[in-house]
Amino acid sequence: MTIRLLGRTEIRHLAKSIDFRPRKSFGQNFVHDANTVRRIVSASSINRSDHVLEVGPGLGSLTLALLDRGAKVTAVEIDPVLANQLPTTIAAHSHSEVNRLTVLNRDILTFKQSDMTEMPTALVANLPYNVAVPALLHLLAEFPSIRTVMVMVQAEVAERLAAEPGGKDYGVPSAKVRFFGNVRRYGMVSPTVFWPIPRVYSGLVRIDRYETSPWPTDPEFRQQVFELIDVAFAQRRKTSRNAFAEWAGSGNESASRLLAASIDPSRRGETLSINDFVRLLQRSADWHVVPKPESAATAVATDEDAQVPTL
């Protein structure tokens, strides 16, 4: 039996029935267009074998479409009113599908593996605009079991996530997300499919985790790569030689490390790919001892099973 999806009128009536008003502080804008949620689910390529982690399910539009695909769904909702209502809404629109749904009232930025009994294989979500990037990076780090990501974010954020090195939109999020996998855009979404209507367009982004990571995935290695990315984009128009001078100890030392990594010291940080950042760290570890935070333990760069996030 096909699940009955939510429409615009029903979304409003449902909100009114529980005396709910969307909160800007939670970035609450709910999709009410059935074609849009079907498009998101189709682009995610999930099936009955998947366990989907959904962030911010809200009133349940996307949740219903995910369940309609036959997948298990764990929906993480920060708003207790919406978290309490969601199982009732799902039960009213389907039959046994509610048995494949778990709802957790949690803050996604502090959500961790111990909050779940079964690890997710996919992340599909309409991410709140105000926490989209930190939430995405946190979940990719915390749940290496997630192989596929399909998220709807603010159009500007989507452009940044999918931007290539050297482009005007390329920045910290672009580089960091590629530490985990390949990124691509899946088009735009009009503000008119939301309630309340946001002032900006949204964009769909898909991330496919590398089948075999090209580099170590332990938390300490990731932290040091991310620190290099932050340094490079703190003053993105500087040459790499000057941008990394403080990190390396001097301009000359910076140039030596860059050359050891086959990077032209005159290149700007905004042109460096994730491969460049990783290679710079790895070559620097051979060339000299890489500075680490005082709290960091001895590097274990080969521990690819470590799963504690350090963002």
Curated annotation (Swiss-Prot):
Gene Ontology, cellular component aspect: cytosol
Binding site for S-adenosyl-L-methionine: 29, 31, 56, 77, 107, 126
Reported function: Specifically dimethylates two adjacent adenosines (A1518 and A1519) in the loop of a conserved hairpin near the 3'-end of 16S rRNA in the 30S particle. May play a critical role in biogenesis of 30S subunits.
Organism: Mycolicibacterium vanbaalenii (strain DSM 7251 / JCM 13017 / BCRC 16820 / KCTC 9966 / NRRL B-24157 / PYR-1) (Mycobacterium vanbaalenii)
Compartment(s) of residence: Cytoplasm
Keyword Methyltransferase: yes
Alphabetical list of SUPFAM superfamilies matching this protein: S-adenosyl-L-methionine-dependent methyltransferases (SSF53335)
Assigned keywords, A-Z: Cytoplasm, Methyltransferase, RNA-binding, rRNA processing, S-adenosyl-L-methionine, Transferase
PANTHER family with a match to the protein in the record: DIMETHYLADENOSINE TRANSFERASE, DIMETHYLADENOSINE TRANSFERASE-RELATED
Pfam families found in the cross-reference section: RrnaAD (PF00398)
Name of the protein: Ribosomal RNA small subunit methyltransferase A
CDD domains from the UniProt entry: AdoMet_MTases
Catalysed reaction equations from the record: adenosine(1518)/adenosine(1519) in 16S rRNA + 4 S-adenosyl-L-methionine = N(6)-dimethyladenosine(1518)/N(6)-dimethyladenosine(1519) in 16S rRNA + 4 S-adenosyl-L-homocysteine + 4 H(+)
Cross-referenced HAMAP family: 16SrRNA_methyltr_A
Major localization listed first in the record, in broad terms: cytoplasm
PROSITE patterns: RRNA_A_DIMETH, SAM_RNA_A_N6_MT
Keyword RNA-binding on entry: yes
Molecular function in Gene Ontology: 16S rRNA (adenine(1518)-N(6)/adenine(1519)-N(6))-dimethyltransferase activity; RNA binding
Record-stated family: Belongs to the class I-like SAM-binding methyltransferase superfamily. rRNA adenine N(6)-methyltransferase family. RsmA subfamily.
InterPro entries: KsgA/Erm, rRNA_Ade_diMease-like_C, rRNA_Ade_Mease_Trfase_CS, rRNA_Ade_methylase_Trfase_N, rRNA_adenine_dimethylase, SAM-dependent_MTases_sf
EC number: 2.1.1.182
